[in-house]
Amino acid sequence: MSDDDQKPEDATPDGSEPAENQPDGETPAAGEGAPDQAGLPGWGSSDKRRGRRSGPMKKGGDARAAKQMFERVKTARGRKSSSTRWLQRQLNDPYVKKAQMEGYRSRAAYKLLQLDERFKLLKPGMRVVDLGSAPGGWVQVALKSGASEVVGIDLLEMEAIAGATLLEKDFTDADAPSLVKAEMGGAADAVVSDLAPWTTGHKTTDHLRIVALAELAAHFAVETLKPGGFFIAKVFQGGSDSDLLNFLKANFEKVRHFKPDASRSESAETFVVAMGFKG
């Protein structure tokens, strides 16, 4: 599951909630809704509670003008400030609104679209695997590109997407690569991952955790891809990814970094793109 789809546990939006299961959530610091775990946290864990609250609305032209300029969220009793910030950011995020209008389950869909626009990766007839696929934005992008087979894997149960196979499974299980290839009828052309662990707020710790997760995804890709295939994974900037990059350079012809416009400007996330799997 992408950190785009994580949110503080007590966050419930005022008015209509995003159609994409609260996408692109602000991952809370330890003690503010995120599990405080040593080592690598469960990459698919999330609280899926949803709800609506409506508060009093001010009348008059000034209030309407203010609403047009910026959507604000009233801090409710019992709601942490991190949740209020998350809700306010959601209401004012153009990619959240665009995802709602265009039918994507997550604003994260635009990251894959922009990665594909930059590197021209997705082609009709491909077999694509999406690791940590909930709620399904990247699966939707792969299907719209004309992929013949799309398999999404997540620890979370996902609502069905026509044309895709969705597995409620840990991709690090020993049998996961063979199971995926059996579902697709052969090796994959692409393995993509927008996975992120719960963040702690400590930059170095978060960087090390996401690099470890990307390394697991890279090993899965090497076991699953056909020669010539590509791999995409999210990492946080931090300078401790040399082992990951060396592994990718040993197994792929080209390795590049790219930060899509859909990634938040304040976010440390970037994507590593490995092309031309050597087999």
From Swiss-Prot:
Residues 1-66 are annotated as: Disordered. It holds the Pfam family FtsJ. Residues 1-10 have a biased composition (Basic and acidic residues). It catalyses: uridine(2552) in 23S rRNA + S-adenosyl-L-methionine = 2'-O-methyluridine(2552) in 23S rRNA + S-adenosyl-L-homocysteine + H(+). InterPro entries: RNA_methyltr_RlmE, RNA_MeTrfase_FtsJ_dom, rRNA-MeTfrase_E, SAM-dependent_MTases_sf. GO terms for molecular function: rRNA (uridine-2'-O-)-methyltransferase activity. The active site is at K234 (proton acceptor). Keywords: Cytoplasm, Methyltransferase, rRNA processing, S-adenosyl-L-methionine, Transferase. It comes from the Bacteria. Its main location: cytoplasm. S-adenosyl-L-methionine binds at G136, W138, D154, D170, D194. The keyword Transferase applies. One of its GO terms (cellular component) is cytoplasm. Its EC number is 2.1.1.166. It is found in: Cytoplasm. Specifically methylates the uridine in position 2552 of 23S rRNA at the 2'-O position of the ribose in the fully assembled 50S ribosomal subunit. Belongs to the class I-like SAM-binding methyltransferase superfamily. RNA methyltransferase RlmE family. This is Ribosomal RNA large subunit methyltransferase E. The lineage of its organism: Bacteria, Pseudomonadati, Pseudomonadota, Alphaproteobacteria, Maricaulales.
